[in-house]
């Protein structure tokens, strides 16, 4: 695990004891820190106590003298009382990424790449890690993807830590200076956590303000908020765009099809070039990359159609590129499963691609508003739930068709998370048989 002498003798409070919280407790205790931990679940408190933590709710104790309150990214700092309680005690509220940043000076010489953005950051993170690993570079992928960073063994000299960073994780980092910082795109998301869209944009921009002058920013300037952030960067900057990718080249990368993946690829290519990879190594990595689950993932063929799981598309801006990837053809019709717990401005971002859709199958809380929004442009089925949508699509498809689950919504009205929704889709498709 990653530990640091800098934590020894200090006292930390840890609020939230899911996977990353318990990993934080373990790393801090192993570093010689004192830890007071809390979670509403008794079994989580027992696990923290077994690791050597004291048990106590940070809201009920005097925090003066603590080095930090470590919270999970899921704690809404704009509403949770811990923010004011820590501020009154002049104690920073941080996350495990900040602890990693503070431990960096004791790690073997390395680089850190941080990737953020509304959409595409998981794919870009995995793609950068894959290209580096394919070139023989020691790599560790973490942050908002994979295992908690503090649980991992430090990389050897010349290794690269590739971190997916949500806006919440950036909010909780104060000294993270990424050698390479990447922004994929920005569109409205998580507005319940910020003071409007401007607050969300400012959170993303902080990743670049934390960098030093000799570090590199890579920003895809295909949207206005990203252009604005790029205009304010005063250190080394590479502006990139999905338009920089030649469709002939992209055709050689089977897991990176569609305009959104052109943007993902151009961001990853720029980062790997900064890190010293040559064009041959980059091309090899692009050609051998495999899609992440729930992101334009081909889950199988059934009833003569190809079925794609894009459950990670939890807003309209992330669903739009998936629709764009399947233009109509005489032997290819697109059946779109959409709906769930709606965010933001409905399906406005998808409207330019409505002409690609033969029929939409609407589910969840968004079924009625989506039907009202798109019923004048697309034939619809009010499916209600995912199982019904799959059954109705299976009855309607013809050989060569595409069925795309790209919900443009969160999943929490009917599923635990987008992964559970994607797995339910996969199971329903597999049950259809070939």
Curated annotation (Swiss-Prot):
GO molecular function, one term: ATP binding
EC number: 6.3.2.9
Residues making up the signal peptide according to the UniProt record: none
GO cellular component terms given for this protein: cytoplasm
Catalysed reaction equations from the record: UDP-N-acetyl-alpha-D-muramoyl-L-alanine + D-glutamate + ATP = UDP-N-acetyl-alpha-D-muramoyl-L-alanyl-D-glutamate + ADP + phosphate + H(+)
HAMAP family given in the database record: MurD
Family recorded in the similarity comment: Belongs to the MurCDEF family.
Protein name, as recorded: UDP-N-acetylmuramoylalanine--D-glutamate ligase
Organism in which the protein naturally occurs: Sphingopyxis alaskensis (strain DSM 13593 / LMG 18877 / RB2256)
Source species taxonomy: Bacteria, Pseudomonadati, Pseudomonadota, Alphaproteobacteria, Sphingomonadales
């Amino acid at each position: 695990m990653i530990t640091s002498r800098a934590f020894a003798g200090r006292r930390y409070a840890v609020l939230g004891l899911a996977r990353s919280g318990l990993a934080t407790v373990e790393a801090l205790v192993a570093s010689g820190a004192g830890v007071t931990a809390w979670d509403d679940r008794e079994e989580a408190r027992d696990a923290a106590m077994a690791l050597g933590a004291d048990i106590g709710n940070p809201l009920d104790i005097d925090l003066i003298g603590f080095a930090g309150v470590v919270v999970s990214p899921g704690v809404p700092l704009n509403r949770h009382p811990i923010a004011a309680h820590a501020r009154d005690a002049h104690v920073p509220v941080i996350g495990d990424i900040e602890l990693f940043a503070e431990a960096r000076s004791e790690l073997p010489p390395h680089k850190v790449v941080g990737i953020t953005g509304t959409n595409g950051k998981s794919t870009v993170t995995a793609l950068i890690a894959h290209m580096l690993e394919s070139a023989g570079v020691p790599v560790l992928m973490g942050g908002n993807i994979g295992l908690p960073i503090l649980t991992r063994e430090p990389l050897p000299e010349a290794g690269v830590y590739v971190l997916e960073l949500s806006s919440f994780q950036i909010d909780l980092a104060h000294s993270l200076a990424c050698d390479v910082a990447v922004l994929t795109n920005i569109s409205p998301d998580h507005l319940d956590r910020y003071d409007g869209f401007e607050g969300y944009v400012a959170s993303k921009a902080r990743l670049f303000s934390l960098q030093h002058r000799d570090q590199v920013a890579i920003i895809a300037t295909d949207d206005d908020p990203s252009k604005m952030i790029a205009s304010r960067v005063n250190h080394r900057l590479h502006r990139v765009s999905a338009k920089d990718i030649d469709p002939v080249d992209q055709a050689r990368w089977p897991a990176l099809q569609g305009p959104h993946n052109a943007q993902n690829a151009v961001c990853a290519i720029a980062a790997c070039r900064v890190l010293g990879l040559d064009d041959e190594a980059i091309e090899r990595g692009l050609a051998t990359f495999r899609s992440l689950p729930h992101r334009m993932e081909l889950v199988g063929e059934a009833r003569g159609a190809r079925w794609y799981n894009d459950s990670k598309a939890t807003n309209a801006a992330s669903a739009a590129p998936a629709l764009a990837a399947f233009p109509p053809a005489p032997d290819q019709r697109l059946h779109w499963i959409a709906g769930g717990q709606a965010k933001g401005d409905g399906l406005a971002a998808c409207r330019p691609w409505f002409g690609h859709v033969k029929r939409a199958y609407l589910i969840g809380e968004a079924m009625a508003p989506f039907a009202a929004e798109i019923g004048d442009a697309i034939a619809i089925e009010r499916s209600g739930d995912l199982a019904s949508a799959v059954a109705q699509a299976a009855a309607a498809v013809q050989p060569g068709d595409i069925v795309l689950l790209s919900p443009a919504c969160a999943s929490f009205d009917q599923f635990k998370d987008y992964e559970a929704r994607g797995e339910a889709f996969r199971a329903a498709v597999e049950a259809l048989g070939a």
